[in-house]
Amino acid sequence: MARRDSGTSKEEGRRDEHVIEAIGRTRVVIRDGRVAEVGTPCIADCPLARKFAMPVSEFTPEAIRANIENRIRSFGMCTGRREVTDTRDFVGFGASELLSSALRAGLIDAVVLACDGAGTVIAPTPALVQGIGGRMSGLVSTSPIPEVIERIKASGGYVLDPDGASIDQVRGTGAAYDLGYRQVAVTVADAASAREVRALHPDAVIVAVHTTGLSRDEAETMVSCADLVTTCASRHLRDLAGSALIQAGTGIPVFGFTRAGKEIILAKVRESKAPVVVKFERLPVAGTGPEPLV
């Protein structure tokens, strides 16, 4: 999950620095493998955070720091030890879980997403999509880590900017088509990128992620441009969900606003062995979600 930004290479003097927004959209800075800064969360509670490998039930700086440090230890986030492939589902209808399933079903043939230490990446395999995205929070900016970039390449991925690790989902989508992929999905975290991708690549599957705090105008743009929208703690996206074709989950629902988005959610349901409830209902259907919505 990534917010559009540009990276600067270490060769140009930048330190090993990575900025993410995690656990209530708290700004966290990681330098040289250590948590250097922890900001203030935008919300007070989230049901997803209580299901993390290291659960966070109270959004304090200490708890958030401990969770991020656990990610660094467990899978090398923002370090040269970063694991980039995985086959486990971490949540039922997460963006990476849905897109990995869509790859297996043949609905798409590549995913454009962002990875700490690499920036924008084109991933053609379910394991690479899940390994990069399954435990990644909102990536604001990153710097290149050669070991991570080489690991992604060895796993069949393509790194858009290996020298700078910039995050540019619009350019990444174009690069995916240039590489010969024809059914491209892309994750976007800002409305401007969603609008630009839709204008340049009408057939791309757009997945809106990291949406907490979107303005009303931004939310309207996401709904009009994206095929799939993860609502996070966005009040405006929930208000606009009545036009969706399908909803997955209730606490942090994911909405499909197009037939392509609906098919991706249904593909995930088809391959899952978990029991499901299917019901015709006016959307959205609310559950116990993040607090407060913003």
Specify the residue positions occupied by each region the protein language model found:
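Conserved mixed alpha/beta catalytic, RNA-binding, or beta-rich assembly cores of soluble enzyme
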Residues: 2-294
